Amino acid sequence: MSTRTIIVLTLTALLASACALGDKRIYNHKIFRPNATSYLIAGGTNSRAVPTFIVGNPFGIAPATLANVVSSSLQSAFPGRDVTFATRRTTGLRDDVFMVVAFDPPKTASAQRICRSRGRISSITVGESIRTLMAFCLAGTPLVSIESKVARGSGTGDKTFVLLLRDMARRMFEAKSKNEI
């Protein structure tokens, strides 16, 4: 074999072994960010159950009730898709991707901040409307996020609130990640 052939085969083998190490390193590289929707509907055992963290309770209702409303509102954004938003810790859930829904986060709260903290931020009730910040995160980095407001007078049973969450999720996953190439 010629020296050139040996070099080409060696480089090909090195490249193949680097890919075999796992795509986690590639996906975590700050330049490469895949489409958020691809992550949301990725296949695998229980991989479509997305851990969802809820910050704040603007209506002062039972946390389980708020969790059910948020989960079902988000799921209604994806009719016909096998994806669920798990608001309670369950075994077998993915830990690389998660959703954060923050009600009345501080003005300084950003998608980056709520993704890094996995929703462990305070909630501050201010004004006549409820600021809602939603982010879909990959390993603590937001792939996509969206912010909106709803009148404080509406409650979780109010159709306006349910439609707001559903429409936010639809718009968010239609958007392309700013880091996507």
Roles of regions detected by a PLM:
Residues 82-95:
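Short acidic low-complexity segments
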Residues 56-58, 103-107, 136-140, 147-150:
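A mature extracytoplasmic/lumenal domain signature
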